[in-house]
């Protein structure tokens, strides 16, 4: 895994003289895991964008005049992607500078000290490589899970919401945890009509 934990562990081990390889599927997401690609960092960028709308509204009381600003969703998405790509490169350079070999592929535990790496060749055909090590650290992180129910095809998770083709004018957020509250707040600030559903009496419990 090439998230925050895997990258840090790989660098620390390499700096102490170990020969280290890190396996990560580098497709739509790069190094850095959830936090960098679909978590903390992009959420902060979108949160900042939402704050500007409120600041613009308050500015009239301080003498600022002119038409209200309009959100350009494609620009926000493009600038977010640009910043995430920059951070992916920072992680890559840190690993390279520490002497870590990055393996692009999906790793499967094959034996106690062995993994099988599933890769795709340039022509699209699948490939497999085997690697052995005295120590194998599992730092795979997690992904959102959507249960099976009628209408499931209309559901997105916190992973997909950053890159929707069109800005959602109406949004229903299910849940009362910090991720749900953050996105409800962000998209409300970006001027979407947001409804938040929660089965309990108090959010953020």
Residue spans for each PLM region:
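N-terminal Rossmann-like FAD-binding beta1-loop-alpha1 element of flavoenzymes
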Residues: 1-22, 173, 179-189
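Glycine-rich flavin
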Residues: 12-167, 200-204
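Rossmann-like NAD(P)H-binding beta-loop-alpha module
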Residues: 154, 165-199, 203
């Amino acid at each position: 895994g090439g998230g925050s934990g895997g990258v840090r562990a790989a660098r620390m081990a390499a700096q102490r003289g170990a020969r280290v390889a890190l396996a990560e599927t580098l497709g739509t997401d790069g190094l850095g895991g959830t936090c960098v690609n679909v978590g903390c960092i992009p959420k902060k960028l979108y949160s900042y964008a939402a704050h500007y709308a409120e600041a613009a509204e308050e500015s009239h009381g301080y003498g600022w005049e002119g038409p209200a600003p309009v959100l350009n969703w494609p620009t926000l998405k493009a600038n977010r992607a640009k910043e995430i790509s920059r951070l992916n490169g920072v992680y890559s350079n840190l690993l390279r500078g520490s002497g870590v070999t990055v393996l692009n592929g999906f790793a499967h535990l094959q034996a106690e000290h062995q993994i099988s790496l599933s890769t795709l060749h340039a022509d699209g055909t699948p490939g497999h490589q085997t690697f052995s090590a005295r120590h194998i650290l599992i730092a795979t992180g997690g992904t959102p899970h959507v249960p099976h129910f009628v209408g499931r095809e209309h559901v997105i998770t916190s992973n997909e919401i950053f890159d929707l083709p069109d800005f959602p004018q109406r949004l229903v957020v299910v849940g009362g945890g910090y991720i749900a509250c953050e996105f409800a707040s962000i998209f409300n600030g970006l001027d979407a009509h947001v409804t938040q559903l929660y089965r309990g009496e108090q959010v953020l419990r």
